A protein has these predicted regions:
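Hydrophobic alpha-helical membrane-insertion segments
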Residues: 1-3
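Extracytoplasmic metal-acquisition and chelation regions
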Residues: 19-257
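Sec-dependent N-terminal signal peptides
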Residues: 5-17
Protein backbone atom coordinates (compact mmCIF):
# COMPACT_ATOMS: atom_id res chain seq x y z
CA UNK A 1 0.00 0.00 0.00
CA UNK A 2 1.58 3.31 -1.07
CA UNK A 3 1.81 6.41 1.11
CA UNK A 4 -1.14 8.21 -0.51
CA UNK A 5 -3.44 5.24 -0.01
CA UNK A 6 -2.38 5.02 3.64
CA UNK A 7 -3.24 8.69 4.16
CA UNK A 8 -6.66 8.23 2.57
CA UNK A 9 -7.26 5.14 4.72
CA UNK A 10 -6.39 7.06 7.89
CA UNK A 11 -8.59 10.01 6.99
CA UNK A 12 -11.64 7.80 6.59
CA UNK A 13 -11.00 5.37 9.45
CA UNK A 14 -9.79 7.46 12.39
CA UNK A 15 -13.13 9.24 12.98
CA UNK A 16 -14.85 5.86 13.21
CA UNK A 17 -12.80 5.05 16.31
CA UNK A 18 -12.79 8.53 17.85
CA UNK A 19 -14.56 8.73 21.19
CA UNK A 20 -16.68 11.83 21.76
CA UNK A 21 -18.12 12.38 25.21
CA UNK A 22 -20.24 15.24 26.51
CA UNK A 23 -20.43 16.37 30.13
CA UNK A 24 -22.23 19.09 32.00
CA UNK A 25 -19.39 20.83 33.83
CA UNK A 26 -15.62 21.16 33.55
CA UNK A 27 -14.64 19.02 36.59
CA UNK A 28 -16.19 15.98 34.88
CA UNK A 29 -13.82 16.51 31.97
CA UNK A 30 -10.89 16.37 34.39
CA UNK A 31 -11.95 12.95 35.67
CA UNK A 32 -12.48 11.56 32.17
CA UNK A 33 -9.17 12.91 30.89
CA UNK A 34 -7.35 11.35 33.84
CA UNK A 35 -8.58 7.94 32.69
CA UNK A 36 -8.74 8.49 28.92
CA UNK A 37 -6.46 11.37 27.86
CA UNK A 38 -7.23 10.93 24.15
CA UNK A 39 -11.00 11.17 24.44
CA UNK A 40 -12.62 14.33 23.08
CA UNK A 41 -14.79 15.92 25.77
CA UNK A 42 -17.48 18.51 25.10
CA UNK A 43 -18.30 20.64 28.17
CA UNK A 44 -21.82 22.05 28.08
CA UNK A 45 -21.35 24.73 30.77
CA UNK A 46 -18.09 26.60 29.98
CA UNK A 47 -15.78 28.00 32.69
CA UNK A 48 -17.03 31.19 34.32
CA UNK A 49 -20.71 30.32 33.82
CA UNK A 50 -23.27 29.04 36.30
CA UNK A 51 -24.82 25.58 35.74
CA UNK A 52 -28.04 27.11 37.07
CA UNK A 53 -28.44 29.73 34.34
CA UNK A 54 -26.30 28.85 31.29
CA UNK A 55 -27.87 28.10 27.88
CA UNK A 56 -25.85 26.04 25.34
CA UNK A 57 -24.83 27.48 21.97
CA UNK A 58 -25.13 25.91 18.51
CA UNK A 59 -21.60 24.49 18.54
CA UNK A 60 -22.22 22.64 21.80
CA UNK A 61 -25.51 21.21 20.59
CA UNK A 62 -23.77 20.03 17.42
CA UNK A 63 -21.15 18.28 19.58
CA UNK A 64 -23.97 16.46 21.38
CA UNK A 65 -25.04 15.00 18.05
CA UNK A 66 -21.57 13.46 17.64
CA UNK A 67 -21.26 12.17 21.22
CA UNK A 68 -21.59 8.54 22.22
CA UNK A 69 -22.10 9.31 25.92
CA UNK A 70 -23.42 12.15 28.06
CA UNK A 71 -22.48 12.22 31.75
CA UNK A 72 -25.14 14.09 33.73
CA UNK A 73 -24.08 15.47 37.13
CA UNK A 74 -27.49 16.52 38.47
CA UNK A 75 -27.20 20.34 38.35
CA UNK A 76 -30.12 22.54 37.13
CA UNK A 77 -28.69 22.62 33.59
CA UNK A 78 -29.25 18.86 33.28
CA UNK A 79 -32.83 19.04 34.46
CA UNK A 80 -33.54 21.75 31.89
CA UNK A 81 -31.76 20.31 28.85
CA UNK A 82 -31.57 16.50 29.13
CA UNK A 83 -34.76 15.99 27.11
CA UNK A 84 -33.41 18.32 24.42
CA UNK A 85 -30.16 16.35 24.36
CA UNK A 86 -32.11 13.12 23.83
CA UNK A 87 -34.01 14.74 20.95
CA UNK A 88 -30.79 15.86 19.26
CA UNK A 89 -29.15 12.45 19.67
CA UNK A 90 -31.62 9.62 20.37
CA UNK A 91 -28.75 7.09 20.40
CA UNK A 92 -26.67 8.84 23.04
CA UNK A 93 -26.05 6.90 26.25
CA UNK A 94 -26.85 9.05 29.28
CA UNK A 95 -25.17 8.24 32.59
CA UNK A 96 -26.89 9.89 35.56
CA UNK A 97 -24.54 10.72 38.42
CA UNK A 98 -27.38 12.57 40.13
CA UNK A 99 -28.86 9.20 41.16
CA UNK A 100 -26.05 8.86 43.72
CA UNK A 101 -27.48 11.79 45.71
CA UNK A 102 -29.17 9.77 48.42
CA UNK A 103 -30.09 12.25 51.12
CA UNK A 104 -29.41 15.74 49.81
CA UNK A 105 -30.60 18.00 47.01
CA UNK A 106 -27.16 19.59 46.88
CA UNK A 107 -25.61 18.49 43.54
CA UNK A 108 -21.97 19.51 44.25
CA UNK A 109 -20.74 15.94 44.62
CA UNK A 110 -17.60 16.29 42.49
CA UNK A 111 -15.52 17.81 45.33
CA UNK A 112 -15.89 14.73 47.50
CA UNK A 113 -12.94 12.31 47.24
CA UNK A 114 -15.35 9.48 48.09
CA UNK A 115 -17.68 10.41 45.23
CA UNK A 116 -14.79 10.95 42.82
CA UNK A 117 -13.78 7.32 43.39
CA UNK A 118 -17.31 6.28 42.47
CA UNK A 119 -17.39 8.63 39.48
CA UNK A 120 -14.05 7.33 38.21
CA UNK A 121 -15.33 3.73 38.40
CA UNK A 122 -18.49 4.59 36.47
CA UNK A 123 -16.42 6.44 33.86
CA UNK A 124 -14.05 3.47 33.61
CA UNK A 125 -16.88 0.96 33.12
CA UNK A 126 -18.57 3.18 30.53
CA UNK A 127 -15.38 3.70 28.54
CA UNK A 128 -14.59 -0.01 28.53
CA UNK A 129 -18.14 -0.74 27.39
CA UNK A 130 -17.93 1.53 24.34
CA UNK A 131 -14.23 1.01 23.58
CA UNK A 132 -13.02 -2.36 24.97
CA UNK A 133 -9.82 -2.36 22.91
CA UNK A 134 -8.30 0.28 25.21
CA UNK A 135 -9.38 -1.46 28.42
CA UNK A 136 -5.85 -1.94 29.78
CA UNK A 137 -4.94 1.72 29.25
CA UNK A 138 -8.10 2.83 31.03
CA UNK A 139 -7.50 0.43 33.91
CA UNK A 140 -3.93 1.60 34.40
CA UNK A 141 -4.93 5.27 34.46
CA UNK A 142 -7.91 4.54 36.70
CA UNK A 143 -5.68 2.88 39.31
CA UNK A 144 -3.36 5.91 39.30
CA UNK A 145 -6.33 8.22 39.80
CA UNK A 146 -7.74 6.16 42.67
CA UNK A 147 -4.33 6.21 44.38
CA UNK A 148 -4.22 9.97 43.94
CA UNK A 149 -7.62 10.31 45.61
CA UNK A 150 -6.59 8.01 48.47
CA UNK A 151 -3.49 10.13 49.07
CA UNK A 152 -5.64 13.27 49.06
CA UNK A 153 -7.85 11.84 51.78
CA UNK A 154 -4.83 11.06 53.94
CA UNK A 155 -3.42 14.53 53.29
CA UNK A 156 -6.71 16.20 54.17
CA UNK A 157 -7.19 14.43 57.50
CA UNK A 158 -3.56 15.11 58.38
CA UNK A 159 -3.30 18.78 57.39
CA UNK A 160 -6.76 20.33 57.90
CA UNK A 161 -6.79 21.99 61.32
CA UNK A 162 -9.91 24.16 61.09
CA UNK A 163 -13.32 22.74 61.96
CA UNK A 164 -15.58 25.05 59.95
CA UNK A 165 -15.59 27.63 57.16
CA UNK A 166 -17.98 30.09 55.53
CA UNK A 167 -18.89 30.40 51.87
CA UNK A 168 -21.63 32.09 49.84
CA UNK A 169 -23.00 29.17 47.81
CA UNK A 170 -22.94 25.64 49.32
CA UNK A 171 -20.49 24.37 46.69
CA UNK A 172 -18.20 22.60 49.15
CA UNK A 173 -20.81 20.64 51.12
CA UNK A 174 -19.55 17.16 50.19
CA UNK A 175 -15.91 18.13 50.65
CA UNK A 176 -16.81 19.30 54.15
CA UNK A 177 -18.78 16.13 54.81
CA UNK A 178 -15.89 13.87 53.76
CA UNK A 179 -13.47 15.64 56.10
CA UNK A 180 -15.93 16.07 59.00
CA UNK A 181 -16.07 19.85 58.61
CA UNK A 182 -18.89 22.36 58.93
CA UNK A 183 -19.75 24.47 55.89
CA UNK A 184 -21.82 27.58 56.62
CA UNK A 185 -23.40 28.88 53.41
CA UNK A 186 -24.70 32.44 53.25
CA UNK A 187 -27.04 31.70 50.37
CA UNK A 188 -30.30 29.95 51.27
CA UNK A 189 -32.47 28.29 48.60
CA UNK A 190 -30.76 30.33 45.90
CA UNK A 191 -31.49 33.66 47.59
CA UNK A 192 -29.14 36.30 48.98
CA UNK A 193 -28.91 36.35 52.79
CA UNK A 194 -30.97 38.75 54.88
CA UNK A 195 -29.20 41.11 57.27
CA UNK A 196 -30.71 39.10 60.12
CA UNK A 197 -29.14 35.90 58.83
CA UNK A 198 -25.79 37.63 58.22
CA UNK A 199 -25.78 38.81 61.82
CA UNK A 200 -26.51 35.26 62.97
CA UNK A 201 -23.64 33.85 60.88
CA UNK A 202 -21.25 36.48 62.22
CA UNK A 203 -22.25 35.56 65.78
CA UNK A 204 -21.72 31.84 65.12
CA UNK A 205 -18.41 32.48 63.35
CA UNK A 206 -17.05 34.45 66.30
CA UNK A 207 -18.21 31.81 68.76
CA UNK A 208 -16.65 28.97 66.74
CA UNK A 209 -13.49 30.96 65.89
CA UNK A 210 -13.93 30.52 62.14
CA UNK A 211 -10.83 31.78 60.36
CA UNK A 212 -11.60 31.25 56.67
CA UNK A 213 -14.18 32.53 54.19
CA UNK A 214 -14.06 30.82 50.80
CA UNK A 215 -15.29 32.80 47.81
CA UNK A 216 -16.17 31.10 44.53
CA UNK A 217 -15.61 33.47 41.57
CA UNK A 218 -18.83 32.24 39.92
CA UNK A 219 -20.95 33.79 42.70
CA UNK A 220 -21.36 37.24 44.34
CA UNK A 221 -18.52 38.20 46.68
CA UNK A 222 -20.18 41.08 48.53
CA UNK A 223 -21.75 39.20 51.45
CA UNK A 224 -18.82 36.86 52.03
CA UNK A 225 -16.45 39.83 52.20
CA UNK A 226 -18.72 41.59 54.71
CA UNK A 227 -18.66 38.56 56.99
CA UNK A 228 -14.91 38.10 56.60
CA UNK A 229 -14.30 41.72 57.56
CA UNK A 230 -16.55 41.48 60.61
CA UNK A 231 -14.90 38.33 62.00
CA UNK A 232 -11.33 39.06 60.88
CA UNK A 233 -11.14 35.97 58.68
CA UNK A 234 -8.89 35.41 55.70
CA UNK A 235 -10.56 35.26 52.29
CA UNK A 236 -9.67 32.50 49.82
CA UNK A 237 -10.90 32.53 46.22
CA UNK A 238 -11.44 28.94 45.06
CA UNK A 239 -13.58 27.89 42.12
CA UNK A 240 -15.56 24.65 42.52
CA UNK A 241 -15.61 24.38 38.72
CA UNK A 242 -11.90 23.97 37.93
CA UNK A 243 -11.13 21.26 35.38
CA UNK A 244 -9.28 18.96 37.76
CA UNK A 245 -11.28 18.49 40.99
CA UNK A 246 -8.28 16.96 42.80
CA UNK A 247 -6.46 20.30 42.44
CA UNK A 248 -9.49 22.10 43.86
CA UNK A 249 -9.51 19.71 46.81
CA UNK A 250 -5.80 20.42 47.35
CA UNK A 251 -6.56 24.17 47.37
CA UNK A 252 -9.30 23.64 49.95
CA UNK A 253 -7.02 21.56 52.16
CA UNK A 254 -4.35 24.26 52.01
CA UNK A 255 -6.89 27.00 52.79
CA UNK A 256 -8.06 25.18 55.92
CA UNK A 257 -4.69 24.26 57.43
Amino acid sequence: MNANLIKIFLIFTIPLFALNISVTILPQKGVIKSIAPDVKVNVMVPPGNSPATYSPDFKQLKAIKNSQVYFSIGVPFDKKYLNKIKEINPNIKIVYFGKYLKTSNNPHIWLSPAFLQLEAKVVLDTLIDINPKDKEIYLQNYKKYINKLANLEVKGFKEIKQKAFITFHPSFYYFAKDFHLKEIALQKQGKAPSFKYLAKVIQIAKKEHIKTVIIAPEFPKKYAKIVAQKIGAKVKVISPLNEEPTKTIEELIKALQ
